[in-house]
Amino acid sequence: MYCSAMPEAASAPAVRATIGDSEFDRDTALTRRAPGVYDIDLSAGWTIISAVNGGYLLAVLGRALVDTLPHGDPFTISAHYLTASRPGPAVVRTDVVRTGRTLSTGQASLFQYDDEGREVERIRVLASYGDLDALPDDVRTTARPPAIPPLEHCFGPEDGPAPVPGSSALADRLMLKLDPSTLGWALGKPSGKGEMRAWFGFADGRDHDPLSVLLAVDALPPTAFELGLKGWVPTVELTVHVRCRPAPGPLRVSITTRNLAGGFLEEDAEVWDSAGRLVAQSRQLARVRLG
């Protein structure tokens, strides 16, 4: 259940974290062991139930590729989620596929050891990087920002008197305020429309950059909830296109599902910044439990 009163958490923190010095930056930081080999301890703070969030994992691999490639901004990144990642030690291995004047392409994989001591690949990524600041200013688009009510009229997990279904450790690290028209699932009255919209930010006040956008596309409750489904909705594949560097301030995220078939659905996301620019688009294929 959600209540109408807004919590103090909706206001900006007294001391805002900065890009490069925030919980997100610390928890996605890697230690280079050798060229193309990185160690990381995946934080339990970015989990849903016990599984590590896919957007957080994408940001981890995205950061490894920043160190590997000569260009620093992800333009397009596609990930296949092979097995569920767990909090704890992991190894990321990267390779350069091709380098060019404006774009560089690389691949990365994250590995962990299973209970039998075998190394298991968790996620594999192929990505192209460039320089977002070098792109021309010309924009020709029919896309429009989502019509989300003002932040003070939206609601987050902390607004209810009891934990919201699907709440997680991830939610504690975010400033997430959902459009009331996409909250029917939390009241036991899902709309059936397969839509989710929200204001998105970090609880510590950190502004956004291309790596945090990789988290934003996969941080909202699943659209499956508004379709009347419950339970875990694991990502099979996720592709993100980063279109420009985000302006300071919260992001608006809109996610839509049009087709659920055979136990799978797509989630198409748009991420808009405070300047009204479309900063990222994504599509993911996810598995759902029917019945």
Where on the chain are the PLM-derived regions?
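Terminal targeting signals and extreme-terminal segments of soluble enzymes
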Residues: 2-291
